[in-house]
Structure formats: C-alpha cells, structure tokens
C-alpha cells in the first residue's frame, strides 16, 4: 500500500478516516480527515493533514507532511501514533483490498509477504474500514496471509462489502485448503454474492512438487477445496507463479488443469515478485522470464485452445513473444508498479504491465524498447 511518513504528528493514537479536501458540514465531520493547506483549521474533524505548520492552540490531531498532492477526496487512510500515513483505500485505484490477516497455513518458498504466527485480530478494524469505502467501488480484494485463517469472520467481511459497496466484485486470494471442509465452502456460497471469485494457486501437477513449494502436504486438500467450491457454483480462478521449480512442467500442469478442473473461470500464469521469501530463496527460484517462453507458450495455448480463459500476469511485453502478448494483463498494483528508463519511447508502454518496484534488481536481460509492431522489426 502507498505510505507517507509525517514530519510532525500531534496524535497519540491510531486514526482511521476518509479524506476530504473540500471540507464537510460541521455535523458530518467526525469520520473525516481534512487535508488542506489553508491556515484556517476548523474543528470537528478526526484529524487535519497539511504541508504547513500548525498553531499550538489546535486541539484536533495534526499531521504535517511534505506535500498533500497525493491525497484525493474519498481516499481512506490510517495514521499510526508514529506518524506513518497508510492509504488503505484509494478512490482512483482498481486494486483496493482488505488485508484479512498476516497468518497463513502455508509457507510458500516464493511468498512476497512471509506469514506471522500471532497477531491482533483485524476483523473489527476491517469492518470499519469497509464502511468508509465509496459506495460505487467496482472491485475489492480480500488477501493476506491466508484469509480463511480468520474462520467465519471472512463471511462478515464479505457481507459488509456487499452492504457498503453493492456494485463491487470481490476477489479472494486463498490457498483453497480450508474449502476442503465442505461446510466452510457452503458458508461461502451462502453469502450469495453476485460477483465473487476465489483465486487459488496450484504449482504443479505432481503433489510432491506442489507440497514442497507451499511448505505443507496440502495438495489434495487444495484439490478437494476446488471441487467443493465448484459443487456450490462458485467462480474459481487458478494462479501459477512461474520460477525455476515450476516452469519446466507448465505444459503438463495446463493439461492437468484442463482434465481435472474444466470448471474454472480463468487461469493466470504469473511472473514472480522477488521480495520476502522469494528474495531469501532467490538462487533456487530465479530464472530469466525470457527463458521459459516456450513452456509458457505451450501451456497458455493448450488452455486457450480448449476454451479456458488464460492470462499472463506481471509480465513485460518486450520479454513475451508477440504470440503471447495478447494474454498479458496489467496486474501489478498501481502503488508498486514502475517502469525503467529503457521503457521510455516504447510503443507498447501504456499496455505493458511494468515491473514490481521490488524487482528492480531482478529483471530479464531481454528488456528492450519496442519501437514498432506488426510488420516492423523491433
């Protein structure tokens, strides 16, 4: 998520609020954080953020930052006692998500966010956060950690999204293991959300390889979870993170998916984000994305030709062959999506997924500017 560090903070407790730039009626201010450079600082707001100094007489919590240009009307931010400002919801973003928990029942060798064993329950905080979302929000993710680790509280979050953002599609990133419990899968279905998809990773058609990658012997629980979700008519996406230990069997995995999970809504093959445990295990995981184009091509075309919607996430168009580029999606969250100087002037830059900001030291040696397409020579 996007974060700012304050230069001054008079606040001694955590504050959650919706940003307003224009001000609110005095009877409707208590949930808002006013962001302004005006010297006049009205009362009644949860906090005031400015790039100017504050008077010592102001009783409202005050936070000084370098610049207020990054704030937008309707953003939702959290201000910690140490003055860190976290953007938990951005009104202009299509990548807003609820972080359900940092706990997980897997320890994937390439996890960008290593799990914790214990933490404070976030459910009440998240329910209050969702209430501050704009009612016209089009999509909300639920992520972690492993969201099902919070048990039935997951369904409270889904119902609150449904109430506060009735138009929003929901995407849940889960390892699928908990859904091997058919009663739990039934509870998800009972939420009766109009547009909810569970995205579940599967890393190999061979159980032992998958289990090694996720750090747990759960392959068949994930498979059972997929069948239970399908039994209740849930939308399911499959995700495959590509690295040195998964790329060789991509075609076999694609064939396995087609024969065993023909009911899935989509399959996404994903370039790896090299932070967290992925960085720790980089020597065992890193392979230049250009080097697995043949395996990726075979897997993508196998599924696509058989009617399964197939995408490529987090990939740079110049690394993919022209045949694969139509499958690539801009999937990296805006706050950590960057481009390199070599990308300047590329005719496909606006369509390209870019790079994870955390991946700057681990990029393909085949990155280059595309100066023309179709019959031209790149």
Per-region residue spans from a language model:
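Flexible, acidic/Gly-rich N-terminal and inter-domain linker regions that tether
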Residues: 1-94, 284, 295-296, 304-310
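Flexible mid-to-C-terminal extensions adjoining Fe-S/redox cofactors in radical SAM and related proteins
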Residues: 11, 322-378
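Canonical Radical SAM [4Fe-4S] cluster-binding loop centered on the CxxxCxxC motif
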Residues: 89-123, 356
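Core AdoMet radical
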Residues: 111-123, 136-150, 162-180, 192-223, ...
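Short Fe-S-cluster ligation motifs
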Residues: 130-149, 367-378
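Conserved C-terminal portion of the radical SAM core fold
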Residues: 140, 195-197, 220-283, 291-317
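Distinct, well-ordered alpha-helical segments
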Residues: 152-159, 180-190, 248-256
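Short, electropositive alpha-helical surface patch
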Residues: 159-162, 248-264, 320-337
């Amino acid at each position: 998520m996007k974060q700012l560090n304050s230069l001054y903070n008079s606040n001694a407790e955590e504050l959650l609020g919706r940003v307003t730039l224009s001000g609110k009626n005095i009877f409707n201010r208590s949930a808002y954080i006013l962001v302004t450079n005006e010297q006049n600082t009205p009362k009644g707001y949860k906090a005031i953020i400015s790039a100017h100094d504050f008077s010592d007489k102001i009783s409202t919590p005050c936070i000084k930052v370098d610049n207020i240009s990054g704030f937008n009307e309707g953003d939702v931010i959290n201000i910690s006692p140490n003055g860190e400002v976290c953007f938990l919801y951005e009104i202009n973003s299509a990548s807003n998500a609820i972080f359900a928990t940092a706990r997980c029942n897997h320890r994937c060798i390439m996890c960008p966010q290593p799990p914790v064993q214990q933490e404070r329950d976030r459910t009440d905080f998240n329910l209050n956060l969702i209430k501050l979302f704009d009612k016209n929000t089009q999509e909300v993710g639920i992520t972690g950690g492993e969201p099902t680790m919070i048990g039935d509280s997951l369904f409270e979050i889904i119902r609150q999204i449904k109430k506060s953002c009735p138009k929003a599609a929901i995407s849940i990133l889960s390892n699928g293991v908990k859904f091997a419990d058919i009663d739990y899968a039934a509870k998800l279905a009972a939420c009766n959300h109009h547009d909810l998809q569970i995205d579940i990773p599967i890393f190999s058609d061979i159980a032992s390889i998958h289990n090694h990658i996720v750090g747990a012997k759960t392959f068949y629980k994930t498979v059972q979870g997929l069948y239970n979700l399908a039994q209740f008519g849930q939308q399911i996406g499959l995700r495959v993170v590509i690295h040195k230990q998964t790329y060789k069997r991509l075609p076999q995995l694609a064939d396995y998916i087609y024969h065993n999970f023909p009911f899935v809504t989509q399959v996404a093959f994903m370039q790896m984000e090299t932070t967290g445990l992925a960085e720790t295990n980089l020597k065992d995981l890193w392979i230049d994305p250009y080097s697995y184009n043949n395996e990726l091509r075979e897997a993508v075309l196998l599924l696509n030709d058989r009617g399964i919607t197939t995408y490529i996430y987090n990939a740079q168009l110049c690394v993919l062959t022209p045949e694969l580029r139509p499958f690539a999606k801009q999937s990296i969250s805006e706050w950590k999506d960057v481009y390199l100087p070599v990308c300047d002037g590329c005719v496909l830059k606006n369509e390209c997924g870019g790079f994870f900001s955390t991946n700057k030291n681990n990029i393909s040696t085949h990155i280059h500017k595309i100066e023309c397409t179709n019959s031209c020579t790149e």
